[in-house]
């Protein structure tokens, strides 16, 4: 009996590990990153649209926590923003989460500080990867 429980735990562990380790080379990673950049790094997208996509930004940050280099202070600010956002969304108004409006102040403060740095770092990392891939292709061509 003990052996089968141990085997079961190993199987569960092996099933969880691939999902817990983020593969930044996967197409879903690229799609998610491009989606976020198209929203948060685009000056033509209004704050309302950006605000609606905060859950996707948080999900990306939590799925790939080390992908974008942030200082410890920036990381702490991002974590504080996530906490504040979730706390705000947990408040129910007539049985439903807030539908917008007053959160704009928190969102604007976030965009003015660490959010802008996070998105810029994400964009710069993508640009560096393109340069690296382009140099690799040229090197192979020669």
From Swiss-Prot:
It holds the Pfam family Turandot. GO terms for biological process: cellular response to heat; cellular response to oxidative stress; innate immune response; response to bacterium; response to heat; response to oxidative stress. It is found in: Secreted. Keywords: Immunity, Innate immunity, Secreted, Signal. One of its GO terms (cellular component) is extracellular region. Transmembrane segments: none annotated. It comes from the Eukaryota. Residues 1-22 form the signal peptide. Induction: By a variety of stressful conditions including bacterial infection, heat shock and paraquat feeding. Belongs to the Turandot family. A humoral factor that may play a role in stress tolerance. This is Protein Turandot X. The lineage of its organism: Eukaryota, Metazoa, Ecdysozoa, Arthropoda, Hexapoda.
